[in-house]
Amino acid sequence: MGKHSAAEDDASAFIPPDGGGPADPPIRRLAAISLHTSPLAQPGTGDAGGMNVYIEATARRLAARGVEVEIFTRATSSDLPPIVEMVPGVLVRHIVAGPFEGLDKEDLPGQLCSFAAGVMRAEARNAPGHYDLVHSHYWLSGQVGYLAKDRWGVPLVHSAHTLAKVKNAAMAEGDDPEPRGRIIGEEQVVVEADRLIANTAAERAELVGLYGADERLIDVVPPGVDTEVFSPGDRAAARQALGIGPDEKVIVFAGRIQPLKGPDVVVRAVHQLADRYPDQRWRLVIVGGASGAGRRPGHQLHELVDLLGSRDTIDFRPAVPAAELAVIYRAADVVAVPSYNESFGLVAIEAQASGTPVVAAAVGGLTVAVADGVSGSLVNGHDPGRWADALAAVTLDAPRRDRLSVGARQQAAQFSWDATVDGLLRSYRAARDGARVDQGRTGIARIDQIGRIEANGSPLARVAGR
């Protein structure tokens, strides 16, 4: 990235303000679809991660601006009430689709029909025109999103969050390739969506180059960070609260423990650091739970730690709420983000907002989230020796770490959830003003006087149970 800002890098990618005034009708109500994971779930466990944070943070702020948000997600427990008010103006609707437990994310395509029917039934209880638009998150939700678009006669905005073709091009050892069915599903959503949200200009280029998306319909809207939660603090006090000694060299990895996130890279790197610098006290704090392939025998991180004999230097901790995670960031000398792919990398921004430098892989959105040499460093590849070098360069050079800490705070200050919501609202208005209705694709015959789509005996009508 150099010395210029991430905002400057992507400035040309933002769509201009809509210039709306009193005559511009507001967005009243949004249907957000997050099939496979709920914004109420604890990030760092199961399939919950940055997407959960994103949906929760933007929904709160949309509601604060007068936009009602209803989030549809799959129920994962019989104890969950059908509707939960997250905050005033934000409802989470739990849709029963398949068994409550025992389904991995990879099993969920088989529940798309059931989930879509549940969403349609929930909407059918409302007066026509209840939602102004649909925002789907991840490809599974996009499949339901474009059904809702056609059935309700509203525009669809879609956020991919991750892309199968990008993941398959940068697979970690032990990870499974994304199936062709997902790729086809993503291609379908790209065609159907009225607007696509990309976290960075690089993601926009991937959507265009790999999926044939229309660049004119892609809006670059970076995620943000809650600086009221993630802010600098007393490192000594944070360490005391966590039972960490003042003289320890502390490296933090936060996130789901799965091959894609590369936790094994930092485990091996810290093992090398302990060998290189035996007089130093090293501690790697790993915050999060196993997910996906990371739960399988032979791929579990605990097994690698035992194989290396590194139990004395590794501190496993469960996923924690944001306020507690901020304390862990403050206690660290550096936060490591060795992912094989990230569309953005919220952990990197949260850590920097807490005043902690970040050493991250030079991939995807991390090259925007981290300013190389200013707020941390970017590492090419995943060789543990190279990562050990990069981590040592920060942890063992106190003046350099202090400079990077200042740069980290400045870097994070460029990203805010309010700015994210500004971008989303511009995109929503652009989708509403330019929404397309394809007369030949799904048997849609006409749009009636109140703007609802009438499907003359189409499969959509039957799936929707209307």
Swiss-Prot record:
It is an enzyme of class 2 (transferase). Its EC number is 2.4.1.250. GO terms for biological process: mycothiol biosynthetic process. One of its GO terms (molecular function) is D-inositol-3-phosphate glycosyltransferase activity. Pfam families: Glyco_trans_4_4 (PF13579), Glycos_transf_1 (PF00534). InterPro entries: Glyco_trans_1 (IPR001296), Glyco_trans_4-like_N (IPR028098), Glycosyltransferase_grp1 (IPR050194), Mycothiol_biosynthesis_MshA (IPR017814). Mg(2+) binds at Y329, R330, A332, T356. Keywords: Glycosyltransferase, Magnesium, Metal-binding, Transferase. 1D-myo-inositol 3-phosphate binds at H36, D47, A48, G49, G50, M51, N52, K105, Y138, T162, R182. It catalyses: 1D-myo-inositol 3-phosphate + UDP-N-acetyl-alpha-D-glucosamine = 1D-myo-inositol 2-acetamido-2-deoxy-alpha-D-glucopyranoside 3-phosphate + UDP + H(+). SUPFAM superfamilies: UDP-Glycosyltransferase/glycogen phosphorylase. It comes from the Bacteria. Homodimer. Catalyzes the transfer of a N-acetyl-glucosamine moiety to 1D-myo-inositol 3-phosphate to produce 1D-myo-inositol 2-acetamido-2-deoxy-glucopyranoside 3-phosphate in the mycothiol biosynthesis pathway. This is D-inositol 3-phosphate glycosyltransferase. It comes from Nakamurella multipartita (strain ATCC 700099 / DSM 44233 / CIP 104796 / JCM 9543 / NBRC 105858 / Y-104). The gene is mshA.
